Amino acid sequence: MNNPFALFDLPIEFQLDQNRLSERYLALQKALHPDNFANSSAQEQRLAMQKSAEVNDALQILKDPILRADCIIALNTGEQQNTEEKSTQDMAFLMQQMQWREQLEEIENTQDIDGLMTFSAEIEQSNKEKISEISTALSMKDWQQAKLINDRLRFIKKLMTEIERIEDKLADF
């Protein structure tokens, strides 16, 4: 795995200076702009394009808290996150997932827009709490806990996407 933190000359930390990230991105994109390679060989142009794609990929990783956490864990442990592998050891969270799914299904079936807004706020709050928890786990180098929290964040992200879908559907009525 390429190290997006190194590419952007940033410390390997979960909390990022967003202004510095933006500044570094603009500087890298400016340096790799196709106009700078107009008189270069085809190979140099291709390499600049590849490097530009790497910069864009790295930016996506650094901007997404889940991908950023996966990256930090991988850089420190050498282990890549297997997103297909589901953790069944976290029974309390599995029960929470089932409860949330049932609640969302009920909201959709009854077309309860107010209920959806309340539910959405609850999930947003849970997301913020998990972001704070993963930040702490990563700073303490508690990789197992960080993986567990990141799995929870992955579920919450999917749930938030589902909430948006239902929001759009109910808005069309």
UniProtKB/Swiss-Prot annotation:
SUPFAM superfamilies: Chaperone J-domain, HSC20 (HSCB), C-terminal oligomerisation domain. Pfam families: HSCB_C. InterPro entries: DnaJ_domain (IPR001623), HscB (IPR004640), HscB_C_sf (IPR036386), HscB_oligo_C (IPR009073), J_dom_sf (IPR036869). Coiled coil: none annotated. Residues 3-75 form the J domain. Keywords: Chaperone. GO terms for biological process: [2Fe-2S] cluster assembly; protein complex oligomerization; protein folding. GO terms for cellular component: iron-sulfur cluster transfer complex. The keyword Ribonucleoprotein does not apply. Belongs to the HscB family. Co-chaperone involved in the maturation of iron-sulfur cluster-containing proteins. Seems to help targeting proteins to be folded toward HscA. PANTHER family: IRON-SULFUR CLUSTER CO-CHAPERONE PROTEIN HSCB. HAMAP family: HscB. Interacts with HscA and stimulates its ATPase activity. This is Co-chaperone protein HscB homolog. It comes from Mannheimia succiniciproducens (strain KCTC 0769BP / MBEL55E).
